[in-house]
């Protein structure tokens, strides 16, 4: 069977149209790819431009802002006075079993009585056994009394989130040793040792110094809170703890800009992380989790410069907020605008919430320390006049240069005389101002409690009866 002349004539035309269609599709794909590449490069170049401007802005405001310059400018203590040097020695001298006994259920509810209530005899006996096993560590820890500051070099991991701070974290162990040393010194009537170990406990916190990471400063805040708590306990258990040196040290430490130390360092560390992401030293997946193996995932890298610029500007705004007086910091942080609603700006979008969480801890612990300074002044007033002051202004200037301000309001801290003692307190983060009580262990408002002499050193409550085995 033969094709008709008409069919033979139309076949070449069909092939021409097919070729044109294929060519059009190929051209469209080429154009689409070119558009994607151009858009990718445009995003990257726009980000690089913003990053250049952001880096210039922060350099004008803070010339030593990079990780290298910031650390080079940190102050180092004189030789022999660096508290940070003692921490690894104390750790090495501590028994590996330290703290394991107190982790048992039998002690769970009896390790945090009211400050004016004695620890139970079995708790004290266990503390003696533990301290005896780590006697060399305790002797080393007491030397911190003479080392009111500290410095250690921090080596950032390529992924800065994985930076190890072993010695910094071991400061918590040092605090644990010293708090029990304070407790047993009071039990033994060794008031000088109790006072020295209280100052050493505060200096354990200060050994962290200006370490430029949030984790470091959170540890410093936590250990300082332990020092405040055991200062409260010492005054509630003993009538004659020496106070002037401790008050001066706490007053100085209460004004340390711990939030600023951490925020400046985190800005520098975050910028180092971005640099490692852009250069491929750290895979993006290591920070953001698994990324899609498609165009969307590929575009993430083009957005890194803009994300970096946004993070740098936001962290710089946080640094400027942290430079303000404490009571102005919360409004300054709240005024920082939200980043653009861009799903590619993943890292910069999380910066402010992290700073705010650390700031809350900073304001709370600063309020605690300021309350402690005033509380010590109140106790010194009582020792001299045999009564509590009628108002905090009565402490000035003999016992205080001025009444410290509440970090939450900028107004002077509050004071209340109660039937069983007195309390210095802050309004707290909720601004409720209900910290003026002595006996509530659930009240979380920053405060420092003081008991009348006849209410101090109350006996420990009876030990809980052992649970009976159920009948067979």
Residue locations for each model-derived region?
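Short acidic linear motifs
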Residues: 2-472
């Amino acid at each position: 069977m033969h094709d008709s002349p008409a069919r033979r004539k139309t076949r070449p035309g069909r092939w021409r149209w097919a070729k044109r269609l294929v060519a059009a599709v190929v051209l469209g794909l080429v154009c689409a790819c070119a558009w994607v590449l151009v858009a990718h490069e445009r995003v990257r170049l726009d980000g690089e431009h913003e990053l250049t401007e952001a880096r210039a802005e922060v350099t004008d405001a803070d010339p030593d802002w990079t990780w290298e310059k910031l650390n080079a400018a940190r102050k180092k203590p004189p030789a022999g006075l660096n508290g940070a040097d003692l921490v690894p020695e104390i750790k090495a001298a501590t028994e590996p079993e330290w703290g394991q006994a107190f982790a048992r259920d039998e002690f769970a509810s009896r390790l945090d009585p009211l400050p004016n209530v004695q620890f139970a005899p079995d708790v004290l006996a266990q503390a003696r056994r533990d301290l005896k096993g780590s006697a060399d560590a305790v002797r080393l820890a007491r030397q911190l009394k003479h080392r009111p500051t500290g410095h250690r070099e921090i080596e950032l991991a390529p992924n800065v989130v994985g930076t190890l701070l072993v010695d910094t974290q071991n400061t918590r162990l040092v605090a644990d040793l010293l708090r029990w040393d304070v407790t047993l010194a009071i039990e033994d009537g060794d008031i000088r040792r109790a006072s020295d170990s209280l100052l050493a406990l505060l200096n354990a916190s200060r050994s962290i110094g200006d370490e430029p990471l949030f984790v470091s400063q959170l540890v410093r805040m936590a250990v300082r809170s332990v020092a405040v708590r055991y200062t409260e306990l010492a005054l509630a258990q003993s009538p004659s703890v020496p106070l002037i040196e401790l008050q001066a040290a706490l007053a100085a430490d209460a004004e340390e800009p711990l939030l600023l130390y951490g925020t400046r360092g985190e800005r520098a560390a975050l910028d180092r992380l971005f640099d490692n992401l852009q250069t491929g030293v750290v895979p993006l997946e290591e920070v953001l989790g698994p990324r899609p193996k498609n165009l969307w995932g590929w575009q993430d890298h083009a957005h890194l410069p803009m994300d970096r610029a946004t993070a740098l500007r936001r962290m710089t705004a946080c640094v400027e907020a942290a430079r303000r007086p404490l009571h102005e910091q919360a409004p300054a942080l709240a005024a920082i605008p939200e980043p653009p609603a861009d799903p590619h700006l993943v890292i910069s979008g999380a910066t402010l919430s992290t700073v705010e969480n650390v700031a809350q801890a900073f304001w709370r612990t600063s309020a605690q320390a300021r309350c402690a300074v005033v509380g010590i002044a109140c106790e010194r007033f009582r020792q001299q006049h045999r009564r509590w002051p009628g108002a905090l202004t009565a402490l000035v200037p003999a016992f205080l240069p001025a009444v410290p301000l509440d970090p939450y309001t900028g107004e002077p801290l509050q004071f209340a005389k109660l039937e069983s003692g007195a309390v210095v307190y802050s309004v707290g983060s909720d601004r409720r101002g209900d910290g003026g009580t002595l006996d509530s262990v659930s009240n979380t408002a920053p405060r420092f409690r003081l008991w009348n002499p006849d209410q101090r050193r109350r006996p420990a409550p009876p030990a809980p009866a052992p649970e009976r085995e159920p009948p067979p």
